[in-house]
Amino acid sequence: MIFRTNYIVIFIVSIFISMLWQPVHLSVFVILIVAWLYVYSRDNEPWVIFGSVIDDSTLVLVLLVLTIGIFLLTDVSRGIVIGVLAGLPVVLVHGMCRRNTEMLFVLEDDEEKVAMNTSSSSLSSSS
């Protein structure tokens, strides 16, 4: 959960590298990334267009439809598939390694809780 943004960045960079030889597709991809980043990094104030309030879910839906439409029009699917396939092993290996260390932290936390419960119960019984 913590590394979700990092995983997305890895996929975006691998897609970006796979599109270096297709400058039109790359520029479209960069424009879409900027649009998505703007949607997620802006303030939570709703947009007002022609007197109508546009909420975030509508904005995300419009951007999603626009993204899919542009991907279909520019035939960028091959570059995206190559980029995702290049980034997938990195993310999977990291996910497997991180899971093992996460389990160690869970075990350490459990041991600390048991030690704290034992010490608190011995303090309460001695008073």
From Swiss-Prot:
* Chief place where the protein resides: endoplasmic reticulum
Q: Which residues cross the membrane?
A: 15-35, 53-73, 76-96
> What Pfam family is a match, any one?
PRA1
Its placement in the membrane is given as:
Multi-pass membrane protein
- A single BP term in Gene Ontology: vesicle-mediated transport
Which key words are in the record? Endoplasmic reticulum, Membrane, Transmembrane, Transmembrane helix, Transport
**One GO CC annotation, please?**
endoplasmic reticulum
Q: Where in the cell is it found?
A: Endoplasmic reticulum membrane
Family annotation (PANTHER family): PRA1 FAMILY PROTEIN C (PTHR19317:SF76), PRENYLATED RAB ACCEPTOR 1-RELATED (PTHR19317)
Function field? May be involved in both secretory and endocytic intracellular trafficking in the endosomal/prevacuolar compartments.
Query: What family is reported?
Result: Belongs to the PRA1 family.
- This one is known as PRA1 family protein C
